Amino acid sequence: MSKIQVNNIEALNNAMDLALERDQNVVLYGQDAGFEGGVFRATKGLQQKYGSERVWDCPIAENSMAGIGVGAAIGGLKPIVEIQFSGFSFPAMFQIFVHAARIRNRSRGVYTAPLVVRMPMGGGIKALEHHSETLEAIYAQIAGLKTVMPSNPYDTKGLFLAAIESPDPVIFFEPKKLYRAFRQEIPSDYYTVPIGEANLISEGSELTIVSYGPTMFDLINLVYSGELKDKGIELIDLRTISPWDKQTVFNSVKKTGRLLVVTEAVKSFTTSAEIITSVTEELFTYLKKAPQRVTGFDIVVPLARGEKYQFEINARVIDAVNQLLK
């Protein structure tokens, strides 16, 4: 199998190219997603290759984009809907939550809505309001949706192609700060990464760290070559937020007895709370110390230069690890 060296944005482009090539029912659209190739150039060259009937531009109307996707999916197509930033998805939530997520149940299985909604998320570009949101917990709690967030090129391509194959809607979050952060060798051919399976990044016996998406790059560097090296840390990349891989996390916590959850999202009512609650409910007697979390703060994302205070977590992670290992 041939290999290619790509960053996350190139892996995503390659995945969409393969999906469009393999299945004539796959269509792609969004604001600037056609001729311009997307604001981050994720769809670069795809309209030129597949034509404007399969790859096209939309006006700034996210509710309409999502509604068109639901109808097209019910009608037999496989739409890829690009919402330019996750913070722009609020108008689309009605169509996604009320129709896309419920159509299988509403029709008693007669209809499904196999669409993929792509959303660049999180910090990294020091932009204005609504450009740096972390909304995965909102989508993850909606029954009928799958919510994924890759952190590297291999998983970006594999999870996206798995999302294309899903008979139900998938919310595909893309960490902007990782789009061009590094390159990785991945297969050039078609492959999938199973939705709902976490990735065990490093094995250890002292502490379990669970994370996903934009924080994984820094955590891997800390564990393999930084201040957290040789501390016995087991690092888990969830990859899928919903349904999340409880078994992998539980098996690790049973071994280490300590848990730290790290996310870029705010602290309250989010995935970090769900993971810690589940572990505490089911594995209380295995815990040597109370689980901790390092997250963003419960505030509106700061603008421009203030962004780093919300999203830079390395020092706080090191402090939390030292506290848990005392």
Swiss-Prot record:
Which reaction is catalysed here? N(6)-[(R)-lipoyl]-L-lysyl-[protein] + pyruvate + H(+) = N(6)-[(R)-S(8)-acetyldihydrolipoyl]-L-lysyl-[protein] + CO2
Protein purpose: The pyruvate dehydrogenase complex catalyzes the overall conversion of pyruvate to acetyl-CoA and CO(2). It contains multiple copies of three enzymatic components: pyruvate dehydrogenase (E1), dihydrolipoamide acetyltransferase (E2) and lipoamide dehydrogenase (E3).
Provide a GO biological process annotation: response to nutrient
Q: What is its EC number?
A: 1.2.4.1
Q: Does this UniProt record's set of keywords contain Oxidoreductase?
A: yes
EC primary class: oxidoreductase
The GO terms describing molecular function are:
glycosylation-dependent protein binding; pyruvate dehydrogenase (acetyl-transferring) activity
**Name of this chain's protein:** Pyruvate dehydrogenase E1 component subunit beta
PANTHER family assigned: PYRUVATE DEHYDROGENASE E1 COMPONENT BETA SUBUNIT, PYRUVATE DEHYDROGENASE E1 COMPONENT SUBUNIT BETA
Q: Which Pfam families match?
A: Transket_pyr, Transketolase_C
Judging by the UniProt lineage, the source's domain of life is Bacteria
Q: How does it assemble?
A: Heterodimer of an alpha and a beta chain.
Signal peptide extent = none
